Amino acid sequence: DLKVGVVDIGRLLADSPQAKAAQIAIESEFGPQQRELENRENELKARSEKAQRDSVAMSDAEREKLEKELRDARRDLDRREQEFRDDAQAKSRVETQRVNKVIFEEIKAYSKANGFDLVLTGGLQGGVLDYRESLDVTTAVLAQLQAKYKPAAAQPMPQPKPPAKSN
């Protein structure tokens, strides 16, 4: 008899503590920079609106100088935002690959430990459209991921080695 299981990778990516921790790490790393960029965007918008209101009272030279400053500031902000997006996306890809590796290793370990001949992917991201609920092993794999998860803060700090004794 062929023993078959189906696992919903999307659910594991959404619900595993490893994936949630990766998302929190990305948000904590990039959140402050995102807020700074949003503040700069708001400041630039306010400067632009003020310049538009005040432009009537300016000379042509003053208006052109201010418009150039605003264009330069916009270009600089656009460049910073693009760099931020690139950095955040790169970090997200790295974290996603790391979490995927952990999840796939856990699926393989579960499959081997429970004597499965074949484990397929189901759910929205999978290749199996319809299957009996009795074939779904997602909850069991998720339980193993949860059991093996150790938050970074909970891991013991390496202890310094005692100084070498000199004779």
Residue ranges of predicted features:
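Amphipathic alpha-helical segments
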Residues: 1-114, 118-126, 148-167
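A generic structural micro-feature
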Residues: 112, 133-134
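A structural signal for short loop-to-beta-strand junctions that line the ligand-binding cleft
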Residues: 127-131
